Design a protein with these regions (language model features):
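Conserved beta-strand-loop-alpha-helix hinge in the C-terminal portion
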Residues: 76-98
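Short C-terminal domain-edge/linker segments immediately following a structured domain
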Residues: 52, 84-85, 101-102
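Broad hydrophobic/π-residue packing in well-ordered secondary structure
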Residues: 1, 26, 90, 99-100
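ABC transporter nucleotide-binding domains
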Residues: 1-73, 77-79
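ABC-family P-loop ATPase nucleotide-binding domain
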Residues: 106-108
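A generic structural signal for secondary-structure junctions
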Residues: 70, 91, 95, 103-104
Length: 108
């Protein structure tokens, strides 16, 4: 079974018990573009039904899938907000630049 299918099966198994919160740790790590796209669609389909806590090192993934984002460094919370709020606070229109700003400045 491919990595993409393994992740989909794992998420499906977790959803069987109808959790209120779903924790996804780096869910697209190592996936190809098509598998990632399919998984993103699945995650988006859960919005409004399940609270999802997702960890990722991919800024485009955080921005595309998140209503609110917490930026952490070494276990310390640097900032939290919507992607738009974080970009505005950093004075940029790119989320990756907002992330870099937060990490370099130690806050956002």
């Amino acid at each position: 079974m491919s990595g993409g299918w393994q992740r989909r099966v794992s998420i499906a198994m977790a959803l069987i018990s109808e959790p209120r919160i779903l924790f996804l740790d780096e869910p697209t790590l190592g996936l190809d573009v098509l598998a990632r796209h399919t998984l993103w669609e699945g995650i988006r389909s859960l919005k409004g039904k399940v609270t999802i806590v997702l960890t990722t090192h991919y800024m485009e993934e955080a921005e595309a899938l998140s209503d609110r984002i917490a930026i952490l460094k070494n276990g310390r919370l640097l900032g939290v907000g919507t992607p738009e709020e974080l970009k505005e606070k950093a004075g940029t229109d790119r989320f990756e630049e907002a992330f870099v700003f937060a990490v370099k400045e130690g806050t956002i």
